[in-house]
Amino acid sequence: MLQAIANEYKFNIIRIYCSWVYLNPEPGKFDFTEIEEVLTDCDLLGLKVLMGAVIEEAPYWLEAAHPESRFVDALGESQRLQTASINMSGGWPSLCMDWTPIRDAAATFLRELARVVSRHPSMYAYDVWNEPHLEPSGGHEFNASTDQKLYCYCEKTIASFQSWLKQRYGTLEKLSEAWVRRYPSWEVIDPPRGPGSYIDWVDWRRFMIERSTEEMRFRVQTLRAVDTRSILESHVFSQAAILPLALQAINPWRLAELMETWGLSYFPRCRNPPFTSARPKSN
């Protein structure tokens, strides 16, 4: 297959999707055998490789050790790891990176991946975060209520939001004035979960957008600490500029500033063609 890609179809680069849940099946155990086989063949064929570093699929052993780290929606329901339409290995939508054990485990996987693949001449670039967005929100985009698309309401994310508010407003009095509330302490502040006022929603989404930006920075810095040669790339949905950002919680322009190469996914025939086409409708 790779020979046909290189010689018959004249491609010069391929993409590999490296799933955390598949490559790290047990604590401290990594199996990159299949990845290295492909890379070795690409070395011989002169093909370059765009390596997808996918931590949106967390290992089941990690969920078992830290069930409290599951994403939580606005209704208070936690999201168990499962398969998804684009991911047959399971582990979706990963676990919340606001929990230190989860972030540490993800960093270990990214470092180990970079250590192994960076030895190969065919290794060209990392897809640091495939179509970045708040993962469970994206997966539920077409088949859930708004409450079930809003994340994350786990205790660590709420605590981080409270700290962010403290840094933003300085005093509880200033926050209470801006939000038209009378809070007795920072600890009782809960993010908005349904229709209500605007200013608390704006702050909550600003916080989540900053959180996504910092997660991208974490991924970039972790990979770059091991591999100083390969390009760091990411890309958004083709319609990223008009995504429901309140749900996806990203600022593509902020994310792009962290990357060496930035792009987008574009599938002209995917889902509803008029949505991604400038062609006018016929009468």
What label would you give each PLM region?
Residues M1, A6, L258-W262:
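Extended, compositionally biased low-complexity polar/Lys-Gly-rich tracts
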Residues A74-E112, V116-W253, L258-F275:
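Polysaccharide-binding and catalytic clefts of secreted carbohydrate-active enzymes
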